From Swiss-Prot:
Gene3D superfamilies: Classic Zinc Finger. The keyword Phosphoprotein applies. It comes from Gorilla gorilla gorilla (Western lowland gorilla). One of its GO terms (biological process) is regulation of transcription by RNA polymerase II. One of its GO terms (molecular function) is DNA-binding transcription factor activity, RNA polymerase II-specific. This is Zinc finger Y-chromosomal protein. It is found in: Nucleus. One of its GO terms (cellular component) is nucleus. Its main location: nucleus. The modification Phosphoserine is found at residue 270. Belongs to the krueppel C2H2-type zinc-finger protein family. ZFX/ZFY subfamily. The keyword Kinase does not apply. The gene is ZFY.
Length: 801
């Protein structure tokens, strides 16, 4: 048989278990080979203890074998002993290694290693086939004499398939059967008989402790092996087959001749430290230590009698820790994010996206596990005979970010402490703050919760300055509420309506009180009438007063526009629709907003719009032609003779041959009179309450009342001793003595040269229309408020209707 050359290549976390059958040749020494992800140092010390750790040894002659994922350190002076006489011996072992970042191929002579042809282990075959999801286990694989490494493979080789896909949720099957000599490679968990007949086994065997992390209750009935009770309380993630599982495997040194291994052990809060090397570090009093399901397994002879488990006296040293499942944190986190959307919100999320050992330094207080509680911390004791076991102090825990995120320290794959960012909601841990921020989007119900809440209302915000500004608004509101004060008694009210009701009480008490003007002898029983008197008579800034509401204006044109609010007159009508407006500016705005599409053509100078191009061209001629037609009476210029004629007739012609039969108003042209007559259609005549004057225009009636029926006329004409309320009215009156045409009122002695003033006089003075009548005395009023005040004053025993 030719000599085989094989390569040692590290694989993903797989375990090789040796099942010693009845026909297998028994050799002294350790009987288990474990392939792990971390760096492994195999010592050649012939002792009952073996050192396996993840630190670089002190021996400078060690050969370093590196791979992308893991590092393995093996001393060069490894010897192999003859175990199988019929097997061929592999003289040369080619081991690729990276020393000082350079690729070196070194031949290590193993003169006594026997490698048969039917080697199926993926890390021993010459083809170096990578099988991350399968573990090929021989029935005889031994590590003997502590410092001598042997790989033995018999003819009857079976294949054990262990699924370690990080995206598969059921990593640990619901039932683990342990037997011996089965068609498949089975891990025997039967207890080791105390009365072992082979007393020559003086060396120790290696045993495994598998932490299932509350995957289910592990039961052992002696004959059938170790099973997982699927009826026990399971994780929701496992039921849905969406969450990956992490298995922790702890390898112990124990003496099979003295201890019975196998079965299940529950480590509870009352067992802070046991006899088998697993120490539960002290936790804070406020953190509850959860129960952890653990099973201890060993390779045992199938012919041994089943005994009850006794793990109280297991060996004092844990010398290896292996984690199976979730090798890649990023892939697991991505898979968890995909499945998390399908999990019900009420179900508890019970998986952790990082496959690192959850261990802390001495100064760590704890970390939330995937169930939201603090997990017990496992401590690996140091053996007295292991002098070369390096001690590594973990880095100090970083100060947590008090603003948003907290940090935790765990032991990474390379053995060094790493800072992670745990999610405080589901317990997931991430390498960077950015991954945590991205993960927090999966908890919208918690992101919606805001930090700051207003104690006075339901306002919430995440910014402190926003809450401060909101509280200031409460202060301003409280001040504004207190700002409404009664001027008679000083009482404060929250709104104007309450103040108005309160003032009615004062009016009832002082119903007979007369309000006097401080500038003249005018007096009235109503405060509102006194206010209007002050505005109309003694106000210089707003001489033109509205008799309906008492509002003053600087110019008569403004008062005229305002009076349309009370009369409801809307003389401006849209030529495209039935829209009417009391103001020309509102009509222009209406046309631009509503009919801009109907008139797409605009003038570039004045921005007026037209329906077609011909109208635009005709309109532009107005801007292009020079205004050559000069008015002989003023500085007005027109672009054509027709415009000039229209200007002369309307401004400089005092003869109005066309008179209105209803209001006696004159016009220059019949068309103007026709438009004016249309105003009177549908309108009722307004009668003055002081005289027989009536007019259709209420504005003229208001001017009539103010000018004729007001006794206070401080401005007197020196020539005719006629009185006027304002100085500008006196100036207009003085023009009547200069020979100009005077408009004489037919109802009184009022006369003026101003046609608009004459119209206002007739409306304000000689109008007698009071639409709001009292139901009890039939007295008329101009506004409903005046009628209500009258009822409260004179008919208070009846009350408001």
């Amino acid at each position: 048989m030719d000599e085989d050359e094989f390569e040692l290549q590290p694989q993903e976390p797989n375990s090789f278990f040796d099942g010693i059958g009845a026909d297998a040749t028994h050799m002294d020494g350790d009987q288990i080979v474990v392939e792990i992800q971390e760096a492994v140092f195999v010592s050649n010390i012939v002792d009952s203890d073996i050192t396996v750790h993840n630190f670089v040894p002190d021996d400078p002659d060690s050969v370093v074998i590196q791979d992308v994922i893991e590092d393995v350190v093996i001393e060069e002076d490894v010897q192999c002993s003859d175990i199988l006489e019929e097997a061929d011996v592999s003289e040369n072992v080619i081991i690729p290694e990276q020393v000082l970042e350079s690729d070196v191929t070194e031949e290590v002579s193993l003169p006594h290693c026997t490698v048969p042809d039917d080697v199926l282990a993926s890390d021993i075959t010459s083809t170096s086939t990578s099988m991350p999801e399968h573990v090929l286990t021989s029935e005889s694989m031994h590590v003997c004499d502590i410092g001598h490494v042997e790989h033995m493979v018999h003819d009857s080789v079976v294949e054990a398939e262990i699924i370690t896909d990080p995206l598969t949720s059921d990593i640990v099957s619901e039932e683990v059967l342990v037997a011996d000599c089965a068609p498949e490679a089975i891990i025997d968990a039967s207890g080791i008989s105390v009365d072992q007949q082979d007393n020559d086994k003086a060396s120790c065997e290696d045993y495994l402790m598998i932490s299932l992390d509350d995957a289910g209750k592990i039961e052992h009935d002696g004959s059938t092996g170790v099973t997982i009770d699927a009826e026990s309380e399971m994780d929701p993630c496992k039921v849905d087959s969406t969450c990956p599982e992490v298995i922790k495997v702890y390898i112990f040194k124990a003496d099979p001749g003295e201890d019975d291994l196998g079965g299940t052990v529950d480590i509870v809060e009352s067992e802070p430290e046991n006899d088998h090397g697993v120490e539960l570090l002290d936790q804070n009093s406020s953190i509850r230590v959860p129960r952890e399901k653990m099973v201890y397994m060993t390779v045992n002879d199938s012919q041994q009698e089943d005994e009850d488990l006794n793990v109280a006296e297991i060996a004092d040293e844990v010398y290896m820790e292996v984690i199976v499942g979730e090798e890649d944190a990023a892939v697991a986190a991505a898979a968890a994010a995909v499945h998390e959307q399908q999990i019900d919100e009420d179900e508890m999320k019970t998986f952790v996206p990082i496959a690192w050992a959850a261990a802390y330094g001495n100064n760590s207080d704890g970390i939330e596990n995937r169930n939201g509680t603090a997990s017990a911390l496992l401590h690996i004791d140091e053996s007295a005979g292991l002098g070369r076991l390096a001690k590594q102090k973990p880095k100090k825990k970083r100060r947590p970010d008090s603003r948003q995120y907290q940090t935790a320290i765990i032991i990474g794959p390379d053995g060094h402490p790493l800072t992670v960012y745990p999610c405080m909601i589901c317990g997931k841990k991430f390498k960077s703050r950015g991954f945590l921020k991205r993960h927090m989007k999966n908890h919208p119900e918690h992101l919606a919760k805001k930090k700051y809440h207003c104690t006075d209302c339901d306002y919430t915000t995440n910014k402190k300055i926003s809450l401060h500004n909101h509280l200031e608004s409460h202060k301003l509101t409280s001040k504004a509420e207190k700002a409404i004060e009664c001027d008679e008694c000083g009482k404060h009210f929250s709104h104007a309506g309450a103040l108005f009701t309160h003032k009615m009480v004062h009016k009832e008490k002082g119903a007979n009180k007369m309000h006097k003007c401080k500038f003249c002898e005018y007096e009235t029983a109503e405060q509102g009438l006194l206010n209007r008197h002050l505005l109309a008579v003694h106000s210089k800034n707003f001489p033109h007063i509205c008799v309906e509401c008492g509002k003053g204006f600087r110019h008569p044109s403004e008062l005229k526009k305002h009076m349309r609010i009370h009369t409801g007159e809307k003389p401006y009508q849209c030529q495209y629709c039935e829209y009417r407006s009391a103001d020309s500016s509102n009509l222009k705005t209406h046309i631009k907003t509503k009919h801009s599409k109907e008139m797409p053509f605009k003038c570039d100078i004045c921005l007026l719009t037209f329906s077609d191009t011909k109208e635009v061209q005709q309109h532009t001629l107005v801007h292009q032609e020079s205004k050559t037609h000069q008015c002989l009476h003023c500085d007005h210029k027109s672009s054509n003779s027709s415009d000039l004629k229209r200007h002369v007739i309307s401004v400089h012609t005092k003869d109005y041959p066309h008179k209105c039969e209803m209001c006696e108003k004159g016009f220059h042209r019949p068309s103007e009179l026709k438009k004016h007559v249309a105003v009177h259609k549908g309108k009722k005549m307004h009668q003055c309450r002081h005289c027989d004057f009536k007019i259709a225009d209420p504005f003229v009636l208001s001017r009539h009342i103010l000018s004729v029926h007001t006794k206070d006329l401080p401005f007197r004409c020196k020539r005719c001793r006629k009185g006027f309320r304002q100085q500008n009215e006196l100036k207009k009156h003085m023009k009547t003595h200069s020979g100009r045409k005077v408009y004489q009122c037919e109802y009184c002695e009022y006369s003026t040269t101003d046609a608009s003033g004459f119209k206002r006089h007739v409306i304000s003075i000689h109008t007698k229309d009071y639409p709001h009548r009292c139901e009890y005395c039939k007295k008329g009023f101009r506004r409903p408020s005046e009628k209500n005040q009258h009822i409260m004053r004179h008919h208070k025993e009846v009350g408001l209707p």
